[in-house]
Amino acid sequence: MTCKENLNNKVNGWLVINKPKFYTSNKVLILLKKKFKFQKVGFCGTLDPLAIGMLPIAIGEARKFIRFVTNHKKTYIFSVKWGISTTTYDIEGPIISKTEFLPNRESIEETLKLFIGNIDQVPPIFSAIRVGGTRA
């Protein structure tokens, strides 16, 4: 019996991957399945291709606990490129407008207050988010 065959039958648990930029969450999952021959594997949530960060992977019986892991608060760290707008709302899309205006600290802090608490949002068309199993 090879190591890979043994892993497929014996591993039940969690693996937390530091997802690299430009990889989709699904691409990470596919690579793990291919490398270790896992048959039952899933991830919690999803990270957009430009995001770098923790991607919890559930292997084997641990998949039964994904629903208990996903409904918790998350923390995001981000950077901002002031003065441009793109068609995709991120740095990847073509720039559609530019400005030399730079907001001051006070106006940034006031604007950030609008994003505290529960907020209903419509995801952009380019988002990887799914609602009810279909892309939002």
Identify the residue ranges that each predicted region occupies:
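Catalytic/RNA-binding core of pseudouridine synthases
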Residues: 1-136
